[in-house]
Regions:
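Active-site regions of oxyanion-processing enzymes, predominantly non-cytosolic
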Residues: 103, 111-127, 147-169
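Short, structured patches in soluble enzyme cores that scaffold and shape functional sites
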Residues: 90-92, 129-131, 168
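Short, hydrophobic/amphipathic alpha-helical packing segments
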Residues: 29-33, 145-152
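Short secondary-structure boundary segments
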Residues: 36-40, 48, 151-154, 169, ...
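Formylglycine-dependent
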Residues: 83-84, 120-135, 139
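N-terminal catalytic scaffold of extracellular/periplasmic and nuclease hydrolases
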Residues: 1-94, 99-117, 122
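Phosphate/oxyanion-binding active-site loops and adjacent basic polyanion-contact surfaces
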Residues: 68, 140-148
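Active-site His/acidic residue clusters
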Residues: 57-62, 132-139, 157-178
Length: 178
């Protein structure tokens, strides 16, 4: 049996094998500690960058705990309650206005443009498309490099170091299309 992005993302982020579709849980649906959560315990800065929705299987596997990968609304709710310093990618459709307000009330800054003026004292949630970002051939803005630069510039300010997961999600999708 071939693994999927949720199970492989969970294995990559935690060292724990699990079933296809699982995000941050083991085969008994018990939460597993991820590298991102470990980094936060060490007072390191943390970030997630993806060209898919930020709540998609691979990025979600580093910070969420749900029994099935398609629960992107629930994953967004969990993200809003975390202390992740930078979350950049697509998926605004899974972040209703009330959830974005909750995120902002918890000390976050919501942006929809890579050129937004950032508040250095706030965590960043950048959602640049309703769903996944457009492909490069479709004129993707922002680019993976632009998002990575924004994340790294923010995260490197932490004297304890940082952990960031950067996924060029659409490489995976290209593989599925072949």
């Amino acid at each position: 049996r071939v693994t999927d992005s949720a199970a492989s993302g969970t294995a990559l982020s935690s060292g724990q094998k699990t079933y296809n579709g699982a995000i941050g849980v083991d085969i008994d649906t018990l939460n597993v500690k991820t590298m991102l959560e470990w980094a936060e315990e060490k007072n390191m800065a943390t970030g997630l960058v993806a060209t898919s929705t930020v709540t998609h299987a691979t990025p979600a596997s580093f910070a969420a705990h749900v029994d099935y990968r398609k629960k992107e609304w629930q994953i967004a709710e969990q993200f809003a309650e975390t202390e992740i310093d930078v979350i950049l990618g697509g998926g605004k459709t899974f972040w209703p206005d009330e959830l974005i307000k909750e995120y902002e009330n918890r000390g976050g800054q919501f942006i929809e443009s890579i050129d937004a003026q950032l508040n250095p004292e706030k965590r960043i949630l950048g959602l640049f498309a309703e769903g996944a970002l457009p492909t490069v051939n479709e004129g993707r803005t922002p680019t993976t490099t632009q998002m990575a630069d924004m994340a790294l510039n923010k995260l490197e300010q932490n004297p304890n170091g940082f952990f960031v997961m950067i996924e060029e999600s659409q490489v995976d999708w290209g593989g599925h299309a072949n």
